[in-house]
């Protein structure tokens, strides 16, 4: 329980209670999400029974976590956005642009409040339940979450009254945008609506078509000026549906359908496992072990840093988390206590943050497999050698630099290695544990992720005592802004993906490509360019949802193996994260190492070139992807 200082106002007390309640609901949801599948495995294995409706509870906990977690992400101001354009604006324009962005975001969120309320009432009747809980209760967390995000955007829009009113006017604008959903709600409660409501609805349809086109352009421009990506993606989808007379409830419906799928719960679970690792001293133990193993090799510290970064990115699913969590430790190892220059170290750490995307249990591979409707196992098998190529490329530059600068090495010390192995063995067993349980078919992917969370929580609290049990809620609350931010992007981008497919955009694009591009090589070159640019401007989860459905049919036309196409897709986006001037990892690195962005650009270029070479090898030599599939697929 928290204590309030004497004289604390009643308003402050209420705010603190509400904040603690919000944290508590998010934590309990994440805790149950991690625990239920693990308990299910135990009950099935030892007692041949299970928890009734356990899968449905888990899926709907993810749904709840998406929107309440999204509200918490807004509270921490952690929703993904592109700030590069905003940073180059004159100071006198930054304030007005921020108000316009806030107004747009509030308007779109308000429109989603109405459409999700309509969806909750029209899609499910009161008898639809999960156990004893009506499904509508879960669905209602969608408008609650959108409302919470909108209120927080308003709160952060400005400290001055007039600009805040201008931003707050977005609630009115969003209500106008959502008139068809409001009409549906009114009709649901009052079936005998007067005829003038029908007249108003017809007038709304006439007006919304030209207005939507303008708003879509404004929204896209706002994305480059710092507006939240999930707002832009969801807003564009909403306006496209409105412009064509589509049901606006389709977007909440698509979000719901996606979030209650079997694979999506894996994302928050592996992210939580990664955060537990990053909050413990696991990074220090692994650095110590790999240093002992490779210190006798010139560039051994680099090899150790690549392996540790790969390990963490694999589990968190976010290269930015690796940079933020391990950047400080590895900076000390490589520069302050090591032989490498600051320029080399910051460039290397910026580039190595995303190396782990191609190794199991990479969340990006899982999500791509779901979208492309191909085997997750095949994707993991196909990604293994390309992942090794990228990883070895990063190691080689360290070895070359060490040789050129005659960096001193240390004799191999078996005692140091043995001690490091003894201290970190439990963390090293985690990927082995995942591979055995999942690939041997003992547990599902969801159950494997759940057991991974339980396993690593026990190791870090009971075995190593790096964390106490009472620290776990704090770790969860740190993880939830990442989890909520990613899940709400997936939910909102699903609507845009659905519209793109429904409008037959992939078919039109495929026909155009067939008529204008005959060479497979030219197609792959263009694909590399487009995807690298996409990686600069979109996070990888949004890109998978929105861009992959466009690319997959094109790959079929040119005879690209589906798994190879997936690896090309992910490797390009990975490179986009470190592509100047707007790659996401560049901003995170600038923040973590407290260096000017221009300096980070310069430092990362050699590593960008090396990873580009690795990407070209992966793209134009499909054998590296398909050889293991031929043996084990």
Protein language model features and the residues they cover:
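Alpha-helical transmembrane segments and membrane-interface helix-loop junctions
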Residues: 1-197, 488
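Alpha-helical transmembrane segments of multi-pass membrane transport proteins
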Residues: 127, 139, 164-633
């Amino acid at each position: 329980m928290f204590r309030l200082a004497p004289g604390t106002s009643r308003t402050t007390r209420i705010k603190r209670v509400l904040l603690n309640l919000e944290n508590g609901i998010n934590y309990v949801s994440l805790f149950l999400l991690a625990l239920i599948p693990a308990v299910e495995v135990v009950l099935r294995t030892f007692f041949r029974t299970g928890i009734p409706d356990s899968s449905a509870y888990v899926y709907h906990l993810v749904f709840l976590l998406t929107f309440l977690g999204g509200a918490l992400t807004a509270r921490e101001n952690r929703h993904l956005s592109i700030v590069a354009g905003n940073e180059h604006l004159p100071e006198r324009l930054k304030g007005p642009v921020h108000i316009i962005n806030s107004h747009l975001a509030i308007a779109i969120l308000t429109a989603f409040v109405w459409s999700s309320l309509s969806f909750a009432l029209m899609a499910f009747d009161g008898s639809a339940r999960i156990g004893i809980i009506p499904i509508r209760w879960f669905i209602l967390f969608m408008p609650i979450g959108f409302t919470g995000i909108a209120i927080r955007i308003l709160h952060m829009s400005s400290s001055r009254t007039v600009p805040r009113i201008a931003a707050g006017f977005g609630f009115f604008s969003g209500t106008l945008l959502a008139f068809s959903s409001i009409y549906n709600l009114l009709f649901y409660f009052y079936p005998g609506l007067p005829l003038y409501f029908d007249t108003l609805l017809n007038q709304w349809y006439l007006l919304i078509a030209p207005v939507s086109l303008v708003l879509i352009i404004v929204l896209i421009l706002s994305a480059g000026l710092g507006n939240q990506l999930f707002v832009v993606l969801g807003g564009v989808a909403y306006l496209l549906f409105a412009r064509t007379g589509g049901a606006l409830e389709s977007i909440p419906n698509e979000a719901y359908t996606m979030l209650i799928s079997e694979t999506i719960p894996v994302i928050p679970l592996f992210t939580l496992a990664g955060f537990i690792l990053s909050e413990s001293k696991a990074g220090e133990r692994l650095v110590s072990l790999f240093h002992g193993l490779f210190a006798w090799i010139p560039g051994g510290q680099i090899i150790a840093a690549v392996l540790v970064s790969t390990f963490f990115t694999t589990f968190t699913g976010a290269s930015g988390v690796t940079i933020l969590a391990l950047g400080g430790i590895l900076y000390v190892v490589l520069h302050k206590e090591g032989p490498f220059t600051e320029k080399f170290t910051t460039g290397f750490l910026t580039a190595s943050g995303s190396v782990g995307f191609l190794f199991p249990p990479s969340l990006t591979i899982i999500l791509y497999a779901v979208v492309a409707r191909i085997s997750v196992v095949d994707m993991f098998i196909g990604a293994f050698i390309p992942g090794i190529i990228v990883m070895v490329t990063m190691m080689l530059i360290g070895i070359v630099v060490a040789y050129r600068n005659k960096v001193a090495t240390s004799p191999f010390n078996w005692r140091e290695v043995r001690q490091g192995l003894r201290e970190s063995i439990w963390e090293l067993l985690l990927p082995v544990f995942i591979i055995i349980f999942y690939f041997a078919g003992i547990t599902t992917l969801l159950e494997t992720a759940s057991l991974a969370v339980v396993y690593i929580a026990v190791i870090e609290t009971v075995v190593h005592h790096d964390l106490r049990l009472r620290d776990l809620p704090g770790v969860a609350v740190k993880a939830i802004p990442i989890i909520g931010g990613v899940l709400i992007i997936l939910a909102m981008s699903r609507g845009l993906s659905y519209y793109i497919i429904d409008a037959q955009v992939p078919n039109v694009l495929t026909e155009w490509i067939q008529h204008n591009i005959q060479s497979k090589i030219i197609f792959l070159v263009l694909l590399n360019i487009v995807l690298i640019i996409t990686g600069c401007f979109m996070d990888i989860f949004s890109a998978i949802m929105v861009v992959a459905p466009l690319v997959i049919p094109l790959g079929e036309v040119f005879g690209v193996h589906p798994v190879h196409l997936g690896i090309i897709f992910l490797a390009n986006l990975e490179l986009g994260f470190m592509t100047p001037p707007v790659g996401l990892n560049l901003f995170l690195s600038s923040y973590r190492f407290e260096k000017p962005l221009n300096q980070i650009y310069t430092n990362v270029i050699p590593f960008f070139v090396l990873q580009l070479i690795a990407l070209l090898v992966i793209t134009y030599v499909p054998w590296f992807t398909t050889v293991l599939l031929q043996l084990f697929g």
